């Protein structure tokens, strides 16, 4: 469960490594949630590939690593991208793990480009509030429900746009690798 990953991220990244509540700690926690999904779909993609692909490449004189890089990975890219899309979709809506690791807001200054400043938008060590945390906070605190609904709609649109973009990229890579 993501709440357990959030507590794990808090203990490891904030307490043990001393990162503090930051974008980096949140990204590392969400990446822990993404690893099983991406690993499982990648393993399924490799196991679903016909064995003669690799054998044919080796038979033509390619080394094992050349076969993996030039045959196996390109043939598996569409299914691997599916895992990335699923993991990213989960990461977009993640609130529990981020609650413990990113903080709950920051005062950004869009004209401040000093990377060490906590108000710089590009500083990965600054606290941050994600859209999913904002939705959670608005619902829990009973503030403006219309703002919470608008934030949820924006989050769904962002996930949809990411999925469309990732699918287009996957189709492009597949078309490029198939020779059409």
Report residues per predicted region.
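Glycine/proline-centered hinge or cleavage motifs at structural transition points of membrane proteins
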Residues: 1, 60-61, 74
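Generic hydrophobic transmembrane alpha-helix motif, especially the helices
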Residues: 1-30
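Hydrophobic transmembrane alpha-helices
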Residues: 12-13, 27-38, 88-92, 102-107, ...
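Alpha-helical membrane-protein architecture signal
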Residues: 24, 31, 35, 53, ...
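Membrane-embedded alpha-helices of multi-pass transport/permease systems
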Residues: 25, 32-53, 81, 85, ...
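Transmembrane alpha-helices
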Residues: 41-42, 64-102
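Interhelical loop and adjacent transmembrane-helix boundary motif
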Residues: 99-156
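Short cytosolic juxtamembrane segments of multi-pass membrane proteins
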Residues: 170-180
């Amino acid at each position: 469960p993501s709440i357990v990953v959030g507590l794990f991220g808090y203990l490891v990244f904030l307490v043990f490594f001393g990162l503090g509540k930051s974008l980096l700690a949140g990204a590392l926690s969400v990446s822990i949630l993404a690893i099983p999904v991406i690993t499982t779909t990648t393993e399924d993609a490799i196991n679903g590939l016909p064995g003669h692909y690799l054998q044919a490449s080796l038979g033509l004189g390619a080394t094992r690593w050349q076969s993996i890089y030039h045959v196996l990975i390109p043939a598996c890219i569409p299914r691997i991208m599916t895992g990335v899309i699923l993991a990213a979709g989960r990461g977009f809506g993640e609130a529990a793990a981020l609650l413990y690791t990113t903080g709950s807001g920051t005062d950004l200054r869009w004209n401040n480009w000093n990377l060490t400043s906590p108000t710089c938008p590009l500083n990965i060590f600054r606290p941050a509030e994600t859209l999913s945390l904002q939705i959670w906070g608005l619902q829990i605190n009973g503030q403006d429900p219309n703002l919470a609904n608008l934030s949820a709609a924006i989050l769904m649109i962002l996930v949809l746009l990411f999925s469309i973009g990732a699918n287009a990229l996957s189709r492009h890579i597949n078309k490029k690798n198939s020779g059409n």
